[in-house]
């Protein structure tokens, strides 16, 4: 049975941890508001670019732009994985890394068996995890979320485009956490390259636009902007989902600490009561012995 001193030491440690988790929850909540606003603001622009690209692709020969042209055979696959730089965010990283493994081992098992699956990892957790397990991580961006800006997303998009154009990848897949709500993150996979209109964009593509100077010239300008914007949107979504996951995890840890403190206080009071009872019994026994 633990002594009173042992329980006091444990109580002190748990109370200290509770203060840390409570502070981290408050910090994550503040960061979540900013991250959520940025993610939501990026969605309309990214969606409109995708809609315009879908409209243009119906008016030009897509084979003239290699980033719009699917390959006859998909022999090489590039997976762009977005995780976080730090932990203490529940299952945020573990779940998305499991999804990435499932995509590689199930959807592209043949390519993986030939060593033809490469990865770009944004975030320290993903790059560390997959490099330790022998995956081909061609480029990592550790610390990217410590100061998240558009230039990082642009660099990733340009690298993916170059690898696709050089034939180092026949398909580029994005794997990330999409922000839905604080309690419901959404694991997502999207095809980045070749660019293909999603379901429902065909109707939007029917909208009539007047193009100057020409659809071909505009699409050449629009494609890189679209890629940069999509990667930027994905990173903003992931950042917001990370802060939501961390806030929820720290809230749960704080509540667990509160419950543990309650249980330990009960144990402490019982142990203290038992010690007092024992001392009283010894005093009474000593007094009786003196009377005899």
From Swiss-Prot:
Main location: membrane
Cellular localisation: Cell inner membrane
Keyword Thylakoid: no
Any GO BP: proton motive force-driven plasma membrane ATP synthesis
Record membrane topology: Peripheral membrane protein
Subunit structure of this chain's protein: F-type ATPases have 2 components, CF(1) - the catalytic core - and CF(0) - the membrane proton channel. CF(1) has five subunits: alpha(3), beta(3), gamma(1), delta(1), epsilon(1). CF(0) has three main subunits: a, b and c.
Name of the protein in question: ATP synthase gamma chain
Source organism: Chlorobaculum parvum (strain DSM 263 / NCIMB 8327) (Chlorobium vibrioforme subsp. thiosulfatophilum)
